[in-house]
Every structure is written in structure tokens, then in C-alpha cells.
Amino acid sequence: MSSIRRYALAALASAVFAGSAVAKDYELLNVSYDPTRELYQDYNAEFVNFWKKDHPGDNVKIQQSHGGSGKQGRAVIDGLRADVVTLALAGDIDEIAKLGKTLPADWQKRLPDASTPYTSTIVFLVRKGNPKGIKDWGDLIKKDVSVITPNPKTSGGARWNFLAAWAYGLKAGGSEAKAQEYVKELFKHVPVLDTGARGSTITFVNNGQGDVLLAWENEAFLALKEDGGADKFDIVVPSLSILAEPPVAVVDKNAEKKGNTQIAEAYLKHLYSCLLYTSDAADEEDSV
């Protein structure tokens, strides 16, 4: 065998083995809150394509876990091996840092906008034609109105609902005592407290319970789009709502153990560059 041929074969073998060494298999777990299923199904497919442009030999599988934000945070504290968390409230991730000790206390400083790649707000979803005439928060405590909202103990969306209701009560009543009185009366109109926002949507949309659903804006629009929802429901934007800022974070110790730190960081950074915003969003000046 000529020296040129031996050199060529050696170079080819070196390239093959080098390629094998570089190519990796990744399995990433994103632990998220309830109504982000569809968002991350779309985003995960987009991210895999993005990653493979620079890492063509890699195999990437992204798993999703969804539920009430508080409940999901508790699961991570108790050992669910999330590489990233994309939860409804910063407080839920703070608890993971404090009790789980799997990421630093200053996690919000690592990504832009306090690690908040997207925002939302709270709106009302009512039956078609709005038969109960629900226009604002004050209408929710009318005698014959039944309100569907998740449990604030387990759901991040429910806590945003609570804060928006409190803000209305404070503005309308002029004192914290009046705000507390309003919120207490509001929850007397809630027949069932599901553990998460998607569960409450099912209760309202599929099971037909309640006159109004307090919903994430994206969840309300999804209800209109699915199964002829536009013929069954209307969205009401109250006079005052809240600017909800769901944060994201890499769970350092979990990602490190699985060799996923680089891809987990890229997963969240890329989230900022490819999100699409709807022109139907509520005006920010109507939020508090």
C-alpha cells in the first residue's frame, strides 16, 4: 500500500472517529407551568433544528412536564430532574434555589429582563354573547355569577389572578381592607379550585361549569381557536389587569450531572430570539 493511500485512510479514519466523539445524545427536561404545552411543543421543534445547524451529528430529545407552577416547583425541589424550569412566578424558582439548592439565589441576573423572555396578562373568558353581562371585576361578585379559577396554593396563574383581583379591589375600595374584602367575596363565587390553569380551562370549556373563567391571555385565545370555540366563547378584557412575567432558569446541578449545561443554556437564550408576539395582546397601560 502506498504511503499516500495509507495517509488518506488514516485521515478518513481520524475524521470518522472525531465525528463520533463530538456527536452527542441529549435528553433535556423542561418543567413548566400549565398552559405552555403548545408553546413549547412548537418551540422545541424549532430549537432542535437551530441546534443541529451547528451540531449536525447530535441527537436531541426534549421532554416537557406541565402542571400548576407551585406544584411543579415543589416536584423539582423533591427531586424531579429538570434541566430548565419555565414557571409562572419568580417565587417558585426562588423556592427551588432556596430549598433544592440546585441553582444560585441570583439566577434572575443571568438572562435579560430578569430572566423573563415573555409576558402575558389575565383576561375573562365568558360564554358566547356574555349572557351574564360581565364587563369588569366588579361583575364577578354579582349574586348569580359563578367564577372558575385555579387554586392559588398550587397554580401560578391563580396567583396572578389573585393579584389582579387584589389590585382592582384596592383601586375600587381605596384600602387594603377593601381589597381583602373584595377578594374574599370573589372566592365565595368559585365552585371548584383546580390545581392548574389548564384544569380550570377544562372545567369551564369542556365540563360547562361557571359563567366566567379567569385565564391567561394565551389560554383564552387557545379556547377560541379549538373545536369551534369562537362560536362558544368571548374574551372580555377588564378595565384593569396585571402584567404577568413568567421567568425561566437553568437548574444548574441537574444539567451539570446530565452533561446538559451547554444545551440547556442555549435552549433558554434562543427562546428570546424566536418568540412571536400577537397583535391581539392586551394594552400594557391597562396592566398594573
What does each model-found stretch correspond to?
Residues 277-282, 286:
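Conserved small/polar residues in nucleotide/adenosyl-binding loops
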Residues 121-130, 245-262, 279:
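A bilobed periplasmic-binding-protein/Venus flytrap-type ligand-binding module shared by bacterial periplasmic
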Residues 24-154:
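N-terminal segment of the mature folded domain
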Residues 19-23:
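Sec/Tat signal peptide C-region and signal peptidase I cleavage site
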Residues 31-33, 107-117, 126-128, 138, 146-172, 224-242, ...:
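Short beta-strand->loop
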Residues 172-239:
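Ligand-binding pocket segment of bilobal, Venus flytrap-like solute-binding proteins
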Residues 1-9:
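Bacterial N-terminal signal peptides that target proteins for export
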